[in-house]
């Protein structure tokens, strides 16, 4: 199990090291959300993550019938997205331990920050890659 937490330590979680996908997202929403050039995200089944501390501090943002964010209600750190298909998107920056699956590609590089240069050899997609 990998450990993760919010910025203020009010919420902690454990997640199985069984991510099915991982990527670096350069879309304008992820850049605004993080204040960084991109956001590294791992996707995993909802049943693979367990909140181990601070469940009472969780805050849901968005439509529970669609995709929504789960944040710490104290520091507002984004802990994961929940999708209707049963998967979660976990920001790798909230993990304490390193996951086995590293990001496999960059997406939305068509709208990436102009000041940032991608220096690795991972595949780059202008938008969300299909299939």
Predicted regions: what is each one?
Residues 1-131:
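A short Gly-Trp-Pro
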